[in-house]
Every structure is written in structure tokens, then in C-alpha cells.
From Swiss-Prot:
Source species of the chain: Rattus norvegicus
Family: Belongs to the AspA/AstE family. Aspartoacylase subfamily.
Record localization: Cytoplasm; Nucleus
Site (Transition state stabilizer): 62
Co-factor note (free text): Binds 1 zinc ion per subunit.
Binding site for Zn(2+): 20, 23, 115
Described function: Catalyzes the deacetylation of N-acetylaspartic acid (NAA) to produce acetate and L-aspartate. NAA occurs in high concentration in brain and its hydrolysis NAA plays a significant part in the maintenance of intact white matter. In other tissues it acts as a scavenger of NAA from body fluids.
CDD domains listed in its UniProt record: M14_ASPA
The keyword Signal is annotated on this UniProt entry: no
One GO CC annotation: cytosol
Cofactor(s) named in the record: Zn(2+)
Official protein name in the record: Aspartoacylase
InterPro entries assigned: AspA/AstE_fam, Aspartoacylase, AstE_AspA_cat, Aste_AspA_hybrid_dom
Organ and tissue specificity: Detected in kidney proximal tubule cells (at protein level).
Amino acid sequence: MTSCVAEEPIKKIAIFGGTHGNELTGVFLVTHWLKNGAEVHRAGLEVKPFITNPRAVEKCTRYIDCDLNRVFDLENLSKEMSEDLPYEVRRAQEINHLFGPKNSDDAYDVVFDLHNTTSNMGCTLILEDSRNDFLIQMFHYIKTCMAPLPCSVYLIEHPSLKYATTRSIAKYPVGIEVGPQPHGVLRADILDQMRRMLKHALDFIQRFNEGKEFPPCAIDVYKIMEKVDYPRNESGDVAAVIHPNLQDQDWKPLHPGDPVFVSLDGKVIPLGGDCTVYPVFVNEAAYYEKKEAFAKTTKLTLNAKSIRSTLH
């Protein structure tokens, strides 16, 4: 008999929009739900929509002083509060106070953090822990409900790449990333896709709380391997751009020798190494400053045990 994991019922959920102030789908949806939350209301659940970086939203910029989605590490969260701290670090401490504290029993059960990308990634769920049966089950449910529209899972578990995301204060952190959409722009198709992903996620939680047992499942995920910078000249400036064959080909297999970059004089730079990879965040606008042209991932399968709520 397959073992069933009994999990505590979910009680508190937050929906974050505006972690990056120019990614407008989450801003638009959360602002709407703050005025009328009927769409995200679920019986027996506390669901709190929240604008995480209001100053950046007001200016329609990614951030004010630094990236809010990279400062939720214990070092920043424990710094003594002062006006000298970057705005986003102060804001992170406020958010941690409201929805955390991180790694504590009082923290919110689930945080959905809504993002857009300029890359052609479609519907993407971001997973931080490959051993989390509850989230693998949730993602399987969302993927099944979204079909035939693809919904990819990006696993950012890595020994040296530490993200310290806004959502990481929750017991179950969920990144929802939908693109392509230019920053500072709203697209109806992207809006609809994100809305549907969140609906299915909330439905899953409600069914789980009501006692439904979810049988064992498996999902394909794309696990981060490394980030690839643009070729640069001696001054540190970008010396080549994403090759047309790679542009908009997120999640597609990229083989050694395939063209990756092309310079102004027509020089083609191929993929090195000896293994096939799957690129994501290809030519993401916000990652130029992070010196990231794309991320290499490897494709693998994650399995989850059967789960049910301890109340049933």
C-alpha cells in the first residue's frame, strides 16, 4: 500500500503583486482583489491580496533601491531598522513581520507571488524545494487543469545560487511567472492565464482542506544549472546578442554547438559543453543588469506521495 502523507490543513494564504513594480499583471489583479476579493475567496481560508512594493508600483519600475525578490535572507531580515537601509530591505522586514516570521510556525502557509517576464516562457510555476509533496501535488493539479496550455515548472533549488525570494517567508512558497509581456504593459491573454493558474491553485487548496486525498503523482521540472552571461568586451560591455535561433525558444532543447549569441560582425557563438540543456529566461529585459542572458536547466521528473489533510 502506498503511504499517504498527512499534512496540516491550509489556513492563511497571501497573494503578492508588485514585488517588481513594472510587472503589471500581478499589480492589476491584486489591486482588483483588494477592492473586490470574491474571486479569490474560499470558504474556511484567509486569503490576503497584498501589494509588496508600493513605491516601485507607483513609479512603474522594478525596484527603488534593490531587488525586493532577492533580500529575504536572514541577514537582511535581521538588520537593525534604520532610514539608511535600502527601501526594499526595510520593506522586506515589514513584509516578514506581516506574513512571517520566515521559518516560524506563525508564518503564512502559502504565498503566491505574481510575476511577468519578457521571455517567451508561457505559464510557469516556480518551485524552491524538490521534496515538497504538497507543492508537487498542487503543481500537478494546476498543470492538469491548464492543459492543453503548457504550464512549465522551474526548480530553483541549487547549492550555490541563493534567491532569497519574497515568497520564501511562507511554508509553501509559489512563484507564478507568465510571459511574454513587456514591463509596464498589460496583455489580456497573459492576464487571463495568470488568473486561471491562481484559480486552480486556490481550488486545489480548498479541495485538500475538504478532505480529498490526492494520489501519487509525477511532474516534469526544469532544474537550474547555471546562469549564462552575454559575451563582453574588455570594457565589460555586451559584445553579442541572443542568436535568432535561440530567441523565444525557452524550454526547448539546446544542444552543444547550437548557436547562442551573434555579434555585430556576424560571429556566431555556439553552446559549449557536452550535454543538452533547456534555456529559460532567454533575453529577459530585467536580467541585463544581473548579467544573465539566459539560464541553463536540466529536465527531470519529481514524484510526490499521496497527500491528504490531517483533519480527515
